[in-house]
Amino acid sequence: MDRKETIKIKVGDKFIGGDSPITVQSMTNTDTRDVEKTVEQIKKLEEVDCDIIRCAVPDDEACQALGKITKKIAIPLVADIHFDYRLAIKAIDNGISALRINPGNIGNEEKVNLVSKKAKEKGIPIRIGVNSGSLEKDILNKYGGVCSDALVESALRHVEILNKVDFHDIVISIKSSNVNQMIESYKKISSKVNYPLHLGVTEAGTPWRGIIKSSVGIGTLLSQGIGDTIRVSLTGDPIEEIKAGKEILRALNLYSKGVEFISCPTCGRTEINLIKIAKEVEKRLDGFDKNIKVAIMGCVVNGPGEARDADIGIAGGKGYGLIFKKGEVVRKLKEEDLVEGLIEEIKNI
């Protein structure tokens, strides 16, 4: 698919926009003031290939902690600032790679200007983070409530404020918990600016519901070439946000690192415990760095026939299974030996 060409923005050692790969972000849910726990969580996120991490900065103590945190992690850190513009200025002096501010609650234009001047001086990009819960009162009154036009107008207003002081290292997000509103808002802003867009559905929910809403919203936009970086917001472990984000990209052929795992839904032809086998194989493959496609199929109808494009897989029989590579059968094993046999073959690829 063709991606819309946007300005390339540098965030630490990563790039957002232009011809850069789409990055996947998350946000810590630790107390930022607790340096040890925050660093521990970020390092776990690094292990699952989190590209950029964001931390909440509610006060001066959290702001000071950023300086210690950034020295102990390998990925760029974005400071998330609300209400107090002075925290944004202090965060820049504490080694962050980017700022996320919500213009609707950071203060008047003069305060935003002070932040942008400091950011420009230090080469720090700013994400304008507009969301449905914090629009300016005059915009809400103009439109009679939250709508896509209101969200877009808020974003454009703050782009203009930054542009007035010749600041252009901008990333934009327009988030809503309403998926249709989110999609409509991003499509509108994409038609008006060429700044990179950070996609996400805010307050998406717990993992099961949140992943569905995020997949629909983020996936729809990405499939239309809109979006340069993503976050799957979940009420849960941030690691699941990264895994979900990578799989959304993988589903659209925008990410190929690691194992692509597929399995059939089972039917009356299945004569092995495929559900158990599939779950175990998927768990065992977590973290494998081989760029391969693995298929777990219940019968010879689906595998190796329909899964012929897989690098390796299982096709179930009655109490046994076939291991195949590129559509060719290489081993026949009892059901209880299939998982170990498959993992052994994968390690030898």
Curated annotation (Swiss-Prot):
[4Fe-4S] cluster binds at C264, C267, C299, E306. One of its GO terms (molecular function) is 4 iron, 4 sulfur cluster binding. Binds 1 [4Fe-4S] cluster. Keywords: 4Fe-4S, Iron, Iron-sulfur, Isoprene biosynthesis, Metal-binding, Oxidoreductase. It catalyses: (2E)-4-hydroxy-3-methylbut-2-enyl diphosphate + oxidized [flavodoxin] + H2O + 2 H(+) = 2-C-methyl-D-erythritol 2,4-cyclic diphosphate + reduced [flavodoxin]. Gene3D superfamilies: Dihydropteroate synthase-like (3.20.20.20), Sulfite Reductase Hemoprotein, domain 1 (3.30.413.10). Pathway: Isoprenoid biosynthesis; isopentenyl diphosphate biosynthesis via DXP pathway; isopentenyl diphosphate from 1-deoxy-D-xylulose 5-phosphate: step 5/6. GO terms for biological process: isopentenyl diphosphate biosynthetic process, methylerythritol 4-phosphate pathway; terpenoid biosynthetic process. Its cofactor is [4Fe-4S] cluster. HAMAP family: IspG (MF_00159). Converts 2C-methyl-D-erythritol 2,4-cyclodiphosphate (ME-2,4cPP) into 1-hydroxy-2-methyl-2-(E)-butenyl 4-diphosphate. Belongs to the IspG family. This is 4-hydroxy-3-methylbut-2-en-1-yl diphosphate synthase (flavodoxin).
